UniProtKB/Swiss-Prot annotation:
GO cellular component: plasma membrane
Gene it is expressed from: ppz2
Function per UniProt: MFS-type transporter; part of the gene cluster that mediates the biosynthesis of pyrrolopyrazines, secondary metabolites showing insecticidal activity. Probably involved in the secretion of peramine and other pyrrolopyrazines.
Glycosylation sites recorded in the entry for this protein: N38
Superkingdom field: Eukaryota
Presence of the UniProt keyword Transmembrane helix in the record: yes
Name the UniProt record assigns to this protein: MFS-type transporter ppz2
Lineage: Eukaryota, Fungi, Dikarya, Ascomycota, Pezizomycotina
Species in which this protein is naturally found: Metarhizium majus (strain ARSEF 297)
Compartment annotation: Membrane
DNA repair is among the record's keywords: no
Amino acid sequence: MQTATALEDSANAPSPAASSQGQFDREIVPIDTADAGNSTKRSPLKVALIMVALCCAVFLHALDNTIITTALPTITAAFDLDAAYTWIGSTYLLAVAASTMVWAKISDVFGRKPIILSANLCFFTGSLIAALSANFAMLIAARAIQGIGGAGVNVLANICVGDLFSQRKRGLYYGVIGGVWAVALSLGPVVGGSLTESISWRWCFYINLPLCAVVFVIIILLLDVKTPKTPFGKGIAAIDWVGAALSIGSTLMILLALSLGGQTEPWNSATVICLVVFGFIGWILCFSWEASLAKYPLLPVSIFKQIPTLAVLAACFIQSYAFVASAYYLPLYFQAVLGATPILSGVYLLPTAVSISISSTATGVYMRKTGQYLTPIYIGFVLQTLGYGLFIDLGPTANWAKIIVFQIIGGLGVGFNFQAPMVALQAFISPRELAMATSAYNFMRNVSGAISVVIGQTVFQNEMSKHQESLATILGPQLAAKLAGTGASASTDLIRSLPSPQRDVVHGVFANSMKSMWIMYTAFSAAALVVCPFLGKMVLREDHTETVTGLAAENAAREERLRQEKEKKDAKIRKCQVN
């Protein structure tokens, strides 16, 4: 038997933010397992190959987030849909958010490599079913399967980087992954539109099949991580299925409420209210279960007990909230106001994608050289707030100098915080909690994005409603009604078909309505500057022991957690006896 070490928080360790060296006091807990081992020395070539494998996997998932956006009108016509077409995108995002944390915990038990391969296979299966869909229900089911697989691929790529590299080094690799993500998101509409126009919308899904196969082979050959020999039955029994059911069910209820509210159901409808209420009750039950009853918790409750980690999650929420706004509403501006085609709107978004890639990678280099993360986080939120504030000045006519410069400023800000908060979060936790904390971070990012789209759309629709009388006078009641409510953001083709005088009026109304939305996003982004002082200052560690996965490691972590809880209770009893 080999002996490895897992670094666990000492029960009486001081706050990391208060430590002069910015590091935890750690206690070494022996883990006896044949699968354990110390960090492997890898050559630069080996590291590069590992990153190629992970980046390919992330690229595929990110591309699928946006590749269908330009194919939606064609898919809508093929299946004779109405407002239900929005579920083609929503189903994918719901599945991603709901399944992220479960994938992370399964990988703690069975190891990273077999689980990321399973996630890739799940994504492949969903893509194949989507490409062959004979009806709308089949397509929606396929998108759910795709989302589940995509969630696993994305979160496990981030977890693998945390497993393999020290805090000091991993910032660079996270920065590279962030850059790949931004480029893929921008290319999605262009690739999807080109495939739809030249071949068929089904190729938006067929294209995933050879790419998935290549990624599968690359991961098998290049991803060098240790895999425990966990018996399948015992491993399945060790998963916290109660916590998984509570977290998935609660998340789905809340996100379904956000998807339905203001779209197919009024916000004050019984359906929406019940989904929200029972969703929050479910999360309260989930936290209670994870904190006191779960044998192998799905959620690291400890991160919600420290101010710095709570601040990091808040920063993550704000960054994702703003990023989704640019990814979702800038294309709407390009199409509805400037009259761009969906493909061109993807091209016009390139300044945002390129600037995010540059600042995300630069942040990783900075963290690797200095061991600090606070400076890029502060700079990022300042630039992000400035950039989104400048978006308020975008008018009904194209001013390309403004459009490009404003995107660069906002994109740089978003990129500085694309991965830095995740590194900050990992600096405050024990290595055994890395997978759970990383999944919680990704979960927060996904939920924030969903909320951002809904709130942004609500603000925009409310502003559009204020102009209905003037639009009805110019366009007539029927055309004006198509630009009201939920139809506003889905009417870009209608706007392009209008005669020039009427089209100019509509462009002005859309531009003015979007100003209020950008004001909201600017104010929300500025709130991050209030959160930043609570992040805590840590020096990123250079030493590293690779995370050990498997049942033996899970049992050791549980025993250590129970020991710490007992010591805290004993300390309280002694304090009461003294008093």
